[in-house]
Amino acid sequence: DKQYEVVRALDRRTGKEVWATEWKGAMSVPFFAAANGSWIRSTPTLDNGELFVAGIRDVLVCLDADSGEIKWQVDFAQRLKTSLPSFGCVCSPLVDGDHVYVQAGGGFTKLNRATGDIVWTTLDDGGGMSGGAFSSPVIGELAGTRQAIVQTRERLVGVDLESGKELWSVDIEAFRGMNILTPTIIGDRVFTSSYGGGSFLFEISKTEGGSFKTQQLWR
């Protein structure tokens, strides 16, 4: 059914279905992307008995992993009054302690894990054909500061976990904004790659005044 998305849990030993949960939330993508399908593109995240699923129509659903019961559901377009991403939501949810992070709702969004309430949203992508990031975020320590590292359609950005403030940013060139790779943290360095734009290694440091500084080591 093209109007619904379905998540199924299977017994690993037998392959039999344990539970199935569905919600209304499907959409069609532009014709040139249709070959990749018009269904969920992100990878679900399982953590401490809870399953977090990002649906293609910019929704985030939290389910009980044992029963499949929906604990909460956020429709970002409805709640934030943002337009749907033309290619659908692609980012996989990132769980960190009491919060969930995802590139949805026209930017990078932090939610309360227990309730689904939005804490903040940042990195406004402007929506339309250039909106809806493809990359999934990571969290790590760079230059002594724990932060989220987020690759948008156009940039690689360090984001403060408490406030959502941008800590640093570098432009990442990619054909039609197809920045898909999840960044990799190596010490105080970040590796990433883009479609048609090459591979990059950046070093993140701080000045004597405490502001962040980026240096491209190679491309």
Language-model region placement:
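Noncatalytic, solvent-exposed loop/strand surfaces
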Residues: 1-219
